[in-house]
């Protein structure tokens, strides 16, 4: 009965949803493209071979989280096709940049019975893996009716989401019974799922697969090549995955730092592509000498900022930097993954708003493997300056964070072990 009301409400809201997509397309015209896929219509698109793996990652962050899993699945099960779905154009671009034609990519339809029915008929998977937090009752129900396992991998549940689901806890039990496995990334999320009524015998704490980063030889070669072209013996700090309200703070800090370190270079990488031009306009307004990564222009001695407006190159940007600030943390967005810069033993600075990754930041703070600052330009400037002035501090901070990364590896293998029965079953 609850799913009936949920579906009815979703149908009633379709005009509002379409208006919302229209508003999004004003800032990012890509939202207007492939609209039919949102309703399970695929036209002349090639359909994947049946009995493959269907993986859903809502946007860029989830795609990044899924990357080591997909790479390993491609290696271990090369005979199984992989269908990758996202919701956002940025997620779509990240899939294409990372995997090219080695996976099939579509937008996941809205969670309407007829749309989901068409999608499942089109893909015909043997297993559905959803990354991190996505719960779609009609998708789960229709997969269950077809005996297709539904797994939430690297699952996390924020306090806010747990509170919202808690209001309808009594109505969740049928949906919980249709989910084959939840592999939680930390104890906090695991306890929240259990509190909401998910059966403990189907709940596993595997750890966060984001710890299983791989800085492969190809990436290291690209880093060496770009470092030769860009660094020119200049110190570089990166402000990565920044959100609205953070760039102004970062640029004010950088302006003050340039007065003391005239050859300091900032790599400024906004989280979302639709903000690339907005940040470029801000750089012009603030009269910084900058270049855009997308133009392949090389920095000269006058370049103060490089705007990272390319897709799929964040690890490359981290690799050539000396100090990293991880964004989404000076504003109440919840922060982003600090493990990527730590893979290079790089000192990491973050704001105080890191509630998206409570377990990771708790461990890093305990071992002094991250430097937390208040949401002011002065605080950020002092943190960067302290690290620029002390190689010992940079190494101590970077090494402490790197040890946390290494000690927590293995989540990917634990997840793969849990997935193996579903992947190898005969249908």
Swiss-Prot record:
Keywords, sorted A to Z: Cell inner membrane, Cell membrane, Lipopolysaccharide biosynthesis, Membrane, Signal-anchor, Transferase, Transmembrane, Transmembrane helix
Signal peptide annotation: none
Active site: 62
GO biological process: lipid A biosynthetic process; lipopolysaccharide core region biosynthetic process
pH dependence: Optimum pH is 7.5.
Gene Ontology CC, one term: plasma membrane
Any one GO molecular function term: Kdo transferase activity
Keyword set includes Repeat: no
Functional pathway: Bacterial outer membrane biogenesis; LPS core biosynthesis
Entry keyword annotation includes Membrane: yes
Stored InterPro entries: Glyco_trans_1 (IPR001296), Glycos_transf_N (IPR007507), Glycos_transf_N_sf (IPR038107), Kdotransferase (IPR039901)
Enzyme class (EC, first level): transferase
Subcellular localization: Cell inner membrane
Catalyzed reaction equations: lipid IVA (E. coli) + CMP-3-deoxy-beta-D-manno-octulosonate = alpha-Kdo-(2->6)-lipid IVA (E. coli) + CMP + H(+)
Transition state stabilizer (site feature) positions: 132, 210
Residues that hold CMP according to the record: 270-271, 311-313, 337-340
Topology in membrane: Single-pass membrane protein
Main location: membrane
EC number(s) on file: 2.4.99.12
Transmembrane segments: 4-24
Comment text on domains: The N-terminal half of KdtA, especially the first 30 amino acid residues, is responsible for determining the number of Kdo residues that are transferred to lipid IVA.
Function: Involved in lipopolysaccharide (LPS) biosynthesis. Catalyzes the transfer of a single 3-deoxy-D-manno-octulosonate (Kdo) residue from CMP-Kdo to lipid IV(A), the tetraacyldisaccharide-1,4'-bisphosphate precursor of lipid A. Is strictly monofunctional, i.e. is capable of adding only a single Kdo residue to the acceptor lipid.
Family: Belongs to the glycosyltransferase group 1 family. Glycosyltransferase 30 subfamily.
This protein's name: 3-deoxy-D-manno-octulosonic acid transferase
Species of provenance: Haemophilus influenzae (strain ATCC 51907 / DSM 11121 / KW20 / Rd)
Organism ancestry: Bacteria, Pseudomonadati, Pseudomonadota, Gammaproteobacteria, Pasteurellales
């Amino acid at each position: 009965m609850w799913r009936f009301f949920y579906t009815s409400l979703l149908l009633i809201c379709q005009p509002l949803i379409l208006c919302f997509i229209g508003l999004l397309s004003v800032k990012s015209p890509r939202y207007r493209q492939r609209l039919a896929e949102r309703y399970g219509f695929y036209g002349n698109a090639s359909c994947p071979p049946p009995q493959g793996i269907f993986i859903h990652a809502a946007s860029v962050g989830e795609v990044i989280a899924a990357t080591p899993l997909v790479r390993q699945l491609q290696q271990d099960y090369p005979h199984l096709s992989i269908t990758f779905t996202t919701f956002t154009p940025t997620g779509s671009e990240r899939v294409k940049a990372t995997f090219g034609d080695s996976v099939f990519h579509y937008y996941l339809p809205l969670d309407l019975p007829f749309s989901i029915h068409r999608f499942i008929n089109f893909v015909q998977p043997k297993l559905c893996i959803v990354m991190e937090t996505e719960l779609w009752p009609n998708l789960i129900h229709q997969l269950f009716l077809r005996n297709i396992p539904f797994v939430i991998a690297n699952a996390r549940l924020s306090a806010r989401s747990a509170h919202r689901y808690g209001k309808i806890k009594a109505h969740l039990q049928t949906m919980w019974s249709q989910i084959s496995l939840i592999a939680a990334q930390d104890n906090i999320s695991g306890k929240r799922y259990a509190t909401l009524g998910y059966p403990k015998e189907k709940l596993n704490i595997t750890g966060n697969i984001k710890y299983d980063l791989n800085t492969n030889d190809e990436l290291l070669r690209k880093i060496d090549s770009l470092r030769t072209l860009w660094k020119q013996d200049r110190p570089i700090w990166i402000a990565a995955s920044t959100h609205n309200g953070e760039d102004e703070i970062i640029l004010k800090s950088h302006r003050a730092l340039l007065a003391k370190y005239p050859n300091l270079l900032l790599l400024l990488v906004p989280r979302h592509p639709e903000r690339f031009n907005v940040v470029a306009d801000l750089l012009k307004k603030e009269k910084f000498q900058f270049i855009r990564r997308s133009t392949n222009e090389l920095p000269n001695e006058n370049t103060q900022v490089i705007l990272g407006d390319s897709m799929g190159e964040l690890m490359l940007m981290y690799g050539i930097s000396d100090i990293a600030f991880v964004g989404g943390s000076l504003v109440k967005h919840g922060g982003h993954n600090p493990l990527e810069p730590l893979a290079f033993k790089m000192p990491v600075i973050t704001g105080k708003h890191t509630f998206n990754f409570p377990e990771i930041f708790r461990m890093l703070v305990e071992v002094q493997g991250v430097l937390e600052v208040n949401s002011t330009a002065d605080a950020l400037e002092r943190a960067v300056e302290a690290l620029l002035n002390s190689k010992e501090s940079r190494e101590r901070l970077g090494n402490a964070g790197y040890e946390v990364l290494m000690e927590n590896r293995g989540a990917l293998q634990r997840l793969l072990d849990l997935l193996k029965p579903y992947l190898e079953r005969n249908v």
